[in-house]
């Protein structure tokens, strides 16, 4: 499996990963559905892991809770296993609820029998009343089952059952018996159940829930060993067994076998007859336990508790490896090996016995006292067995030697969960046999039945009032009760009998009156509106109306308006008082409503006025079609230029109306005819189909189709090319966005429901989900994305929604490929954007859009929208009846929580990488409808077509917000000129105020930790493994032909040889470092790279801005802050020693070239643990010396931006700059989440990989802080034109720049947030190229597009945040107790100082570093693993033994 996993992990293509995940999800769904029956519960992570070990999957998204979910899941799983075994015929179930048959997947038609006896009081509530019997009766079926009860019964119960039920052949039984209870151990599955021992019994507690606990006697555990049960015939006398023959004995035997076992739950199969069964019965044992031999007297002073064998071996090897194993050291080692959470499982007495036993082992000699067979001559070897026999007898008489004692003392007794099966024989034990046949006492349930008689329950219902809201149903129910006489009448409420009325009739009457009032009110509003429209029509004039109506085309056949039947000449509508909100109260006020009679035009008058308005409309013949899609179309509207907007345009005459193909659902045909969208026969362009098929076959386009076999592509193109012509009936529906093109079709599909042969093909998955949500009562496979439809097939009727977004030639190819398609429905908008193919070698790239071909078969274009309000729609030249004003605004900042529209797909992916997941391109947002959208304007906007801009501007229903990403006003106006729609949408938005910096709260005082003791360890236990693989000096050194070997491995001390000593005077190492760390280029190439990475720098900055909480608008420049930062930089420089200042004279000279850099090799000891004793010395690090004025200028710039960064920085982000370990500890304790895995990020060649993209990021960051332009330009110059003695350096980071630390840190933050999708509130800590996060975030999909464009490569390190595995940051471990130095790295560094003889000089520093861990004392056992504890102990002992009597540091006085 490791190889398979390695192959899957090697896939880096996001599309391939998506396909793998999709395939995996399809496989997972039925599996999870299968396991849902037994395990529908929400499980803890630990319990879920245990259940997976038993083959039971857990749904991580389940939220169903249970008091003991894991134990209940195992119980359900055993019932599921039992259900697969039981025959499909009646079975007798004993002690089982009938509803549990669901877990067995039993057919409810099988007439199963239930025998439940109420043995305990709670059995009355547990079992249905109809299944409870007085006592167990004869079983009349071949198979029976006993549920979770057999372990409480006497073995003679099996004898009685099989003796009294001759038809019974097989008995299944489930038992709940924890095997470890036989050894009085703690639960081996503590996440499922726990155990408590009381005297001669114990309690099984599932999920630590006392309400579900069982009490067992230890005698119940005998059921774990039973293999066969034998008995004699009861008709014989008690001594009749003497006359038994073998045949008679065999007739009375049942065989017991373990069928399945999960934790403490077991399924037994008990079969009549003497059959074979395994001699040894084995139960699951997750860990290996042992018990020390009982070697002390009295026996009570021996350790009897089973202990993990691994722990015993660790303790044994410890006491035998240390020089002197003191009693306190052994106790400390035991404390180290036992988790704090497990300490309550041990008694202090048991620990004393264990330590005494280990101390005894430590005192014995391990050298053998016996002679060997290799020494001596022939005579000696001949007499050797005699000598050995004499020595053995001597030890038996006078006592064992130490070696023999040790061998016997370490002969641990294994705790094995395997038992030899036993046969229980009742044939030769008359008393036992009599006990087996005596009648069992069964609880009587007759009195309980009397307590819950039906009469008492029904009496409760007879007291219900007869005048309740649902009086009719209550009266019918009451009349059926036996307690009431047939002629008894229902009492009515007190009061006058004549005034009583049925509440239902009162409510209906009241509802009718309310509805009448609403109808009259709506009629009055309609009459008033018609009068206004009629007045408006008269103002338009007859001339214009006649001119426009002449171009409307032929009148459709169904253009007749519906006629109205005769009605009253006049309507009288009442004017009423406000109607109460609740109808229950209205009954008391209805009579008090005053009605004033108001004369309104009659129905006939209203219809006459309406008809007059319609007659004056240019589109009067199209009113029925407009009404069919929800438009009244009684108003004339005009665009910005004053031209009348026609709701119906682009009419095509001469198209014949074909009949719908056979099998077309009548609901669908009805809706299409109502819109005048009858089908027309369309001959397909086979050349377009062949171009698309060729591209798919050669894998030039597509995502899913590229994964298909080559044979499938050959079959696709072969079938298309074999056709000479292909015609199909098609309904082409064109209309503006939001015109309701799809609404009528969706309405028809909802009426059709499931079972239709219809497929809806959609261009995007978002649109597919939208259709699935709007038409929920159909099969989910009805809606497919276009590639899935091509691969998976379609129905005979295919609906293409937004077909302009499908690849050119796709529609023709699909119809040609599937000959069963007989009707297609195309919905789209010829005014909006169309599909754009980016693959340059694709044949379809040169095809025209599908709308161009199919437009000539579209009967008309519906130029009306329900989406946009009238003002916006009219600006776009579209008809709308939505009233109100569309809000338009513009600023340089983004709004949160609303979709973002950008001009390019590249920008969309990058914006999504910054967390804006609802980002769409102008063209890709087609089909989107949102109340608010924001449209980003940049240099790509001016190259967008009018169709694309129309698509973007028509998405919002209420508000459009424009975001100008450029600070250049002339560029902004150029963007506005790029489209005719933008100049009308201008507004001003106020800027946000700068938020103030809030200082962190003081660290709370914590209680001191309890004292502890660490066991003594071997001095070389940490470094020994590195020394074993150490090579010779010259095998490890770097060799150069011109300079010879390097000199990094020094002295003969193996400890010092582990560490590489890099020195500035080492020429070989210098040139190796220059070759590895520095790259040369030229100014022109550097500047070209800087410009080419502009878009990447933009994305890096957006991610950084979001991560650090910087304001959306630029931060105004503050001269006061700049001068303060410059003063700090100057003071810092002048604080150096005079000697250092003199050494820098050359770089202070005005003659020093501003672009020149002096490069040196950094002298250092390499103390990283991962680089100890490497087979080959690694190159060193360089230090760059710049012109001092340059360093101070850019140092001031970095400090200035740091000042503002700290003001806006979120509290969950910590930057280890000018802070103390105490500050970092306080922050970690308040913000870090230790309940999940964490991620630490490291980089390969971090400085050298900061190329033009990072420089672009730094420039944008500086501009956002309004750094003066001349300083920014100078920074660009020094980064692109830096000279060393070899030439011009490539763009990179150099140690020695002014902003090195801040720039590294901020680049680290930007890169991390660009790569990872980091959840809000995640704790993050940064310093230079080091970082750590308290979660493991997912890699953004957008990052895959940037990964190859960035030189920077990260190396994530995941830690589980548990004992021995904590996130590391700059040599510090972040733990639940605060930060502390990594004990292994601290010890390694200390050993180097000790080996060089410099420990006295730096002891104070090591004591301070050590104290951060030492202060936590006993808690270290929960933080450090065994190896870390060893390193910590050795560091403590080394410092204590260093010879210092006192320590001046107050915090370390208790320590030493």
Swiss-Prot record:
Reactions catalysed, as given in the entry: RNA(n) + a ribonucleoside 5'-triphosphate = RNA(n+1) + diphosphate; ATP + H2O = ADP + phosphate + H(+)
Keywords per UniProt: ATP-binding, Helicase, Hydrolase, Multifunctional enzyme, Nucleotide-binding, Nucleotidyltransferase, RNA-directed RNA polymerase, Transferase, Viral RNA replication
Residue ranges occupied by any RdRp catalytic domain in the UniProt entry: 1236-1343
Entry-linked InterPro entries: (+)RNA_virus_helicase_core_dom (IPR027351), Alphavirus-like_MT_dom (IPR002588), DNA/RNA_pol_sf (IPR043502), P-loop_NTPase (IPR027417), RNA-dep_RNA_pol_alsuvir (IPR001788), RNA-dir_pol_PSvirus (IPR007094)
Any GO BP annotation: DNA-templated transcription
Ranges of Polar residues composition bias in the record: 560-573
Keyword set includes Chaperone: no
Annotated (+)RNA virus helicase ATP-binding domain residues: 695-862
Pfam families xrefs: RdRP_2, Viral_helicase1, Vmethyltransf
EC number: 2.7.7.48, 3.6.4.13
CDD domains attached to this UniProt entry: Alphaflexiviridae_RdRp
Residues annotated as domain (+)RNA virus helicase C-terminal: 863-997
The protein's role, per its UniProt record: RNA replication. The central part of this protein possibly functions as an ATP-binding helicase.
UniProt record similarity statement: Belongs to the potexvirus/carlavirus RNA replication protein family.
Protein name listed in UniProt: RNA replication protein
